[in-house]
Amino acid sequence: MTLFSSISSISNPMTSSKSSIASFGSGTSMSSNSNACGGGCGGGNGGILGLGLGLGLNLFGGSRSRGACGGNNGGSGNPGNGPFSGGSCCGSPCCGI
C-alpha cells in the first residue's frame, strides 16, 4: 500500500478557474496487481469518487486508478474521460497505461 499527499495550485477542469487548494492527493492501492496513481497532479475530473480533488483510490482488483489524470470509471482498466486521461501523472507514465 502506497500513500502520498501533496498540496498544489491546480486548475479545476469543472470550473476552468485556477484555485489554490489542498488536494487530498491519496494514491492508494488496495489490490495486489493494481497501479495507484494520482493526487495533486492537475485536478483531473475527481477520480472514481467524483470529488474533483485529484483522488486516486483503487478499490477494484486489477483495475488501475488514474486519479488526477482523468478518473477511473470503476471498471477494470477503463480509461478516464477527463482532460488528463491518457496523459502522464506529474511527469511519470503511471496514468498513461
From Swiss-Prot:
One of its GO terms (biological process) is sorocarp development. InterPro entries: HssA/B-like_chaperone, HssA/B-related. Coiled coil: none annotated. Pfam families: Coiled. Belongs to the hssA/B family. This is HssA/B-like protein 47. It comes from the Eukaryota. Residues 1-33 are annotated as: Disordered. It comes from Dictyostelium discoideum (Social amoeba).
